[in-house]
């Protein structure tokens, strides 16, 4: 699959280093002594049964959850320890209001990230949803909503993507589009961590089972 992706401002690629991270919920240990180094252009797929802490670990890397122990460092020098300008986050919610169209929603997110509107349609075309640009989100399928959310992530133009079950509601075609989007991001020096229950075909991606870190 060959897609035409838009020209966005150059990324400022950054490394990500996680050292000795431990996380718990109440008295239950979810993750123990987890470490990783992720360089620009790399991707990592985290797997594991429900309850192994995939979402909690992603949220800790994003700075939403304080770990029990360990450290998360982005880049080097003065930007170290700060995720605010480096991370694009995709959680379980797609961030679409039912009465809004993708055009309205994505224009809002583009403005929030100081991006122009021009990349919206090419990114929607790359995800094969350009014909839905003026359809209210309430009339989109879950898979179509997820594709819109992935466009939102790309519009942020951040070097590090943290994706929680990005392919959850996607069909085979959607997963292929997701793989192409991730490949484009990595080709620009971006990196990706994704938590997933599904087998995703991302070339050269690191794979880790969180069940080994409990």
From Swiss-Prot:
One GO BP annotation of this record: cytochrome complex assembly
GO molecular function: ABC-type heme transporter activity; ATP binding; ATP hydrolysis activity
Binding site for ATP: 48-55
Transmembrane helix as UniProt keyword: no
Record bears the keyword Cell inner membrane: yes
Alphabetic keyword roster: ATP-binding, Cell inner membrane, Cell membrane, Cytochrome c-type biogenesis, Membrane, Nucleotide-binding, Translocase, Transport
Domain ABC transporter, residue spans: 16-212
Signal sequence extent: none
Family assignment from sequence similarity: Belongs to the ABC transporter superfamily. CcmA exporter (TC 3.A.1.107) family.
Described function: Part of the ABC transporter complex CcmAB involved in the biogenesis of c-type cytochromes; once thought to export heme, this seems not to be the case, but its exact role is uncertain. Responsible for energy coupling to the transport system.
One GO cellular component term: plasma membrane
Name of the protein in its database record: Cytochrome c biogenesis ATP-binding export protein CcmA
Organism annotation: Maricaulis maris (strain MCS10) (Caulobacter maris)
E.C. numbers: 7.6.2.5
The reaction(s) this protein catalyses: heme b(in) + ATP + H2O = heme b(out) + ADP + phosphate + H(+)
Main enzyme class: translocase
Compartment(s) of residence: Cell inner membrane
Membrane-topology annotation of the record: Peripheral membrane protein
Subunit composition and interactions: The complex is composed of two ATP-binding proteins (CcmA) and two transmembrane proteins (CcmB).
């Amino acid at each position: 699959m060959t897609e035409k992706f838009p020209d966005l401002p150059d990324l400022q690629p950054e490394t990500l280093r996680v050292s000795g991270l431990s996380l718990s919920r109440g008295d239950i240990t979810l993750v123990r002594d987890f470490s990783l180094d992720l360089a620009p252009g790399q991707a990592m797929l985290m797997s594991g049964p429900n309850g192994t802490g995939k979402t909690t670990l992603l949220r800790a890397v994003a700075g939403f959850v304080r770990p029990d122990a360990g450290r998360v460092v982005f880049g080097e020098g003065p930007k170290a320890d700060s995720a605010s300008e480096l991370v694009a986050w995709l959680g379980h919610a797609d961030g679409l209001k039912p009465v809004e169209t993708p055009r309205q929603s994505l224009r809002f997110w583009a403005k929030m990230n100081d991006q122009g509107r021009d990349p919206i349609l090419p990114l929607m075309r790359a995800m094969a949803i350009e014909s839905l640009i003026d359809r209210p989100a309430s009339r989109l399928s879950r898979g179509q909503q997820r594709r819109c959310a992935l466009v939102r992530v790309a519009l942020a133009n951040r070097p590090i993507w943290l994706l929680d079950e990005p392919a959850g509601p996607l069909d085979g075609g959607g997963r292929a589009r997701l793989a192409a989007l991730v490949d484009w991001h990595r080709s620009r020096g971006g990196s990706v961590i994704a938590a997933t229950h599904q087998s995703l075909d991302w070339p050269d991606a690191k794979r880790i089972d969180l069940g080994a870190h409990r």
